[in-house]
């Protein structure tokens, strides 16, 4: 049976469950999915004590790896609540992370291919590559002020 964490409520309930099972302490705040995370599995915010998680990690690696990332973020959370060193460099963090079998580093997510639009100047042949489309009636070549055409 594969666990499906589709909503913020499901995610928060899962984090609360992991906190009780692996730490013996309650998680009293909220957990959120954050699609903007690229190179990290999760983040802990000391100001309001909420956790953000990367949904790509959950989708790509499954619940086992994701649970280890949840443990990692809960190490930050519980140590901060207890007033101990909660940063990666702190001894208390390293010891607790090893004790609960959390991940020290997030596995790499396969990069999403970015599509580019290619344009070239009719006069001088200068080639431009842009992520966003360019209005060809409004913009001209930056070198010779010639007309741009879309090339493939």
Curated annotation (Swiss-Prot):
Q: Which residues form the active site?
A: 73
Q: Which family does it belong to?
A: Belongs to the SprT family.
Q: Which GO terms describe its molecular function?
A: zinc ion binding
Q: Write down how the cofactor binds this protein.
A: Binds 1 zinc ion.
Q: What is this protein called?
A: Protein SprT-like
Locations listed in the record: Cytoplasm
Q: Which NCBIfam families match?
A: PRK04351.1
The record's keywords, sorted A to Z, are:
Cytoplasm, Metal-binding, Zinc
* SMART domains for the chain: SprT
Reported cofactor(s) = Zn(2+)
A Pfam short name: SprT-like
Which positions are annotated as binding Zn(2+)? 72, 76
| Native source organism of the sequence | Streptococcus agalactiae serotype III (strain NEM316)
Residue spans making up a coiled coil are none
Q: Which GO terms describe its cellular component?
A: cytoplasm
Give start and end of each SprT-like domain. 13-148
């Amino acid at each position: 049976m594969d666990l499906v964490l589709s909503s913020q409520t499901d995610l928060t309930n899962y984090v609360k469950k992991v906190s009780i099972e692996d730490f013996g302490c309650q998680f009293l705040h909220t957990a959120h999915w954050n699609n903007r995370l690229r190179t990290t599995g999760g983040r802990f915010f000391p100001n309001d004590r909420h956790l953000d998680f990367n949904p790509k990690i959950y989708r790509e690696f499954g619940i086992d790896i994701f649970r280890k990332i949840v443990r990692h973020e809960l190490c930050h959370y519980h140590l901060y609540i207890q007033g101990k060193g909660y940063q990666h460099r702190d001894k208390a963090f390293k010891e607790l992370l090893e004790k609960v079998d959390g991940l020290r580093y997030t596995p790499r997510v396969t990069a999403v291919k970015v599509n580019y639009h290619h344009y070239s100047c009719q006069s001088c042949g200068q080639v431009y590559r842009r992520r966003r489309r360019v209005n060809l009636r409004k913009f001209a070549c930056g070198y010779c002020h010639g007309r741009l055409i879309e090339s493939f």
